Design a protein with these regions (language model features):
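Metalloprotease/metallohydrolase-associated module, dominated by Zn2+-dependent proteases
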Residues: 1-54, 74-114
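Hydrophobic (often cysteine-bearing) scaffold residues that line and stabilize catalytic clefts
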Residues: 56, 60, 64, 90
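Active-site recognition of the HExxH zinc-binding catalytic motif
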Residues: 61-73
Length: 114
């Protein structure tokens, strides 16, 4: 079971809440990042015959996804991403990944989501 914790995204503390109840989550979301509160929430998941069985692995994937959102916000790219045409060819996102990846990996390690 993953425990709530605080991590630092480019110097800003973000609190991660695991097993957040449905009423605290956007409809249908497995995770969410609230940049106004510096909070990342991961939903309560229960395995059943129609879902992924390894919920811990899935929670880690969702957490990595939300951490990336937080990095993009804290990097100033949150509102500058209106053009999605050929995004994989963008030098901007390629440079961003190259520059931020060591920091991302460190936070992933601290959040225990690798």
């Amino acid at each position: 079971m993953m425990k709530n914790k605080t991590i630092y995204i480019l110097g800003t503390p973000y609190t991660i809440y695991f097993d957040s109840p449905e009423e605290k989550m956007p409809d249908g979301a497995g995770g969410c990042m609230d940049q106004s509160l510096h909070v990342i929430r991961i939903a309560q998941f229960e395995a059943d015959k129609n879902t992924i069985q390894d919920m811990e692995s899935y929670k880690k994937k969702v957490l990595r996804h939300e951490i990336i959102h937080a990095f993009l916000y804290e990097s100033g790219l949150w509102n500058n991403s209106g053009n999605v045409q050929a995004w994989a060819q963008s030098e901007e996102i390629t440079d961003w990944i190259a520059i931020q990846s060591p920091k991302l990996f460190q936070v992933f390690k601290e959040a225990d989501c690798l």
